[in-house]
């Protein structure tokens, strides 16, 4: 009886870009409280569930979320007060049925996710368990490799780079804490080198630097130099990752990339060339979400060599993941809880990926909050990878710091993920 939901309350707060988002608090009959806030993306997939905004230009440039807040404080509260917070499946099923639409357009996925996450946190607190243990059980022990965004481009930055993210993966570290330490050293070395070269050291939405670099190769060469001049190897200590976000420069079947018009075949050959020349082990959204043939070609060419992550292609949706598996598109799935709208559906997407030999990468969004739930999801699911921005901006560091705490709590049971060895 103590796990029964007694009170539900939502409010409007601000995300890392200064735009409104929703925060939800759930209180149980035993006094346990769970609080969760919801992120927002800039580069979004067409088939993501709906983020409900007010569209009132007189408030927050139309981006207010009072409608979502009202949905939580009204119709959702009426439905779930009195329910058992420990039955996450039942809570999420009630939210899905209450919304009644395929894309959660009635209540908004920001409303449903805020409630779903807050309920899980309240239940975990009631059981006096850390969230990762409550969600993952006793077998939870794998600390994820972070995919750390150190150079921003695309829609995340105001520069000439078409690719959205250039990432370092500290695959050679022994522990998560060591992974963060060596990555921070590389990050600060990059800042110093950019400053010496006369580049801006301002950071983008996700905390990476956004210098006015001319080309992809120039960015990759710079990162290799920065890693090695920091005293590390770009072969054994670190590997590289890219988030291309190719849908942003895909038009009428052509990729308009660096002043060139490329077909899917030509872009695939370009990636093959990059992989030969640089220690790249992960490429996200290498093809547009609409370019299925391009995805199939790319997967056939590079799928046995590196990790090919589908974000816009899959949008954390089991139906789309299943289709991708059947048609041999990509070999990994990016997991963003706000793309699907409930915790249960998020874990279902992770399980579908893993059970079919695909890897799962838990991810933040470009508009974040100080909420650290994704850190717990990454550990609870044993998925082994997390993408949560750079080593600046407190909204990104909150996730890394929480993972350091989790590793400390796990003690000798903590195991740093080694599942990327197949691509080294």
UniProtKB/Swiss-Prot annotation:
Keywords for this protein: Cytoplasm, Glycolysis, Lyase, Magnesium, Metal-binding, Secreted
Q: Which ranges does the record mark as transmembrane?
A: none
Question: Can you state which reaction this protein catalyses?
Answer: (2R)-2-phosphoglycerate = phosphoenolpyruvate + H2O
> What job does this protein perform?
Catalyzes the reversible conversion of 2-phosphoglycerate (2-PG) into phosphoenolpyruvate (PEP). It is essential for the degradation of carbohydrates via glycolysis.
Query: Which cofactors, by name?
Result: Mg(2+)
Q: Which family does it belong to?
A: Belongs to the enolase family.
Metabolic or biological pathway = Carbohydrate degradation; glycolysis; pyruvate from D-glyceraldehyde 3-phosphate: step 4/5
Q: Does the keyword Secreted apply?
A: yes
PANTHER family assigned to the protein according to its UniProt record, in alphabetical order = ENOLASE
Q: What is its EC number?
A: 4.2.1.11
Annotated signal peptide: none
Q: How is the cofactor bound?
A: Binds a second Mg(2+) ion via substrate during catalysis.
Compartment(s) where it occurs, according to its Swiss-Prot or TrEMBL record: Cytoplasm; Secreted; Cell surface
Quote a single Gene Ontology cellular component term.
phosphopyruvate hydratase complex
Residues that, per the record, bind (2R)-2-phosphoglycerate: 164, 336, 365-366, 387
Q: What one GO molecular function would you report for this record? A: magnesium ion binding
Kindly give the SMART domains that the UniProt entry links to this protein.
Enolase_C, Enolase_N
Query: Gene that codes for this?
Result: eno
- Native organism is Wolbachia pipientis wMel
Which GO biological process entries does UniProt record here? glycolytic process
InterPro entries per UniProt:
Enolase, Enolase-like_C_sf, Enolase-like_N, Enolase_C, Enolase_CS, Enolase_N
What single Pfam family name could you report for this chain, choosing any that match?
Enolase_C
What is this protein's name?
Enolase
């Amino acid at each position: 009886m103590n796990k029964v939901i007694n009170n539900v309350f939502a409010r409007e707060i601000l995300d890392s870009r200064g735009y409104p988002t929703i925060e939800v608090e759930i209180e149980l009959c035993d006094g346990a409280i769970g609080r969760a806030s919801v992120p927002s993306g800039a580069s979004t997939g067409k088939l993501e569930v709906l983020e409900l905004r007010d569209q009132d230009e007189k408030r927050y440039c139309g981006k207010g979320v009072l409608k979502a807040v009202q949905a939580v404080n009204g119709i959702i509260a009426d439905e779930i007060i009195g329910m058992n917070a420990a039955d996450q499946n039942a809570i999420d099923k009630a939210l899905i049925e209450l919304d009644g639409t395929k894309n959660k357009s009635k209540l908004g996925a920001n409303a449903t996710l805020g409630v779903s996450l807050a309920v899980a946190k309240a239940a975990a607190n009631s059981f006096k368990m850390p969230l990762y243990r409550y969600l993952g059980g006793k077998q939870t022990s794998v600390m994820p490799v972070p995919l750390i965004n150190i150079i921003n481009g695309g829609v995340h930055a105001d520069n000439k780079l078409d690719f959205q993210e250039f990432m370092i993966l500290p695959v050679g570290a022994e522990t998560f804490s060591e992974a963060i330490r060596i990555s921070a050293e590389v990050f600060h070395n990059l800042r110093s080198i950019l400053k010496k070269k006369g580049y801006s050291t301002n950071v983008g939405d996700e905390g990476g630097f956004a210098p006015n670099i001319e080309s992809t190769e120039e960015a990759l060469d710079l990162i290799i130099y920065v890693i090695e001049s920091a005293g590390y190897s770009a072969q054994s200590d670190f590997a590289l990752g890219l988030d291309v976000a190719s849908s942003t420069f895909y038009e009428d079947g052509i990729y308009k990339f660096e002043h060139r018009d490329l077909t899917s075949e030509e872009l695939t050959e370009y990636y093959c060339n990059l992989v030969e020349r640089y220690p790249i082990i992960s490429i996200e959204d290498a093809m547009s979400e609409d370019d299925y043939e391009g995805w199939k070609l790319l997967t056939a060419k590079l799928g046995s060599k590196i990790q090919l992550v589908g974000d816009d292609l899959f949008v954390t949706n089991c139906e789309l993941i299943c289709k991708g598996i059947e048609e041999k598109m990509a070999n990994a799935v990016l997991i963003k809880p706000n793309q699907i709208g409930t915790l249960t559906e998020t874990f279902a997407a992770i399980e579908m990926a893993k059970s079919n030999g695909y890897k799962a990468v838990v991810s933040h969004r470009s508009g974040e909050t100080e909420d650290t739930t994704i850190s717990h999801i990454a550990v609870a699911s044993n998925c082994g990878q997390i993408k949560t921005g750079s080593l600046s901006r407190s909204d990104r560091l909150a996730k890394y710091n929480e993972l350091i705490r989790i590793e400390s709590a796990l003690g000798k049971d903590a195991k740093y993920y080694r599942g990327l060895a197949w691509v080294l």
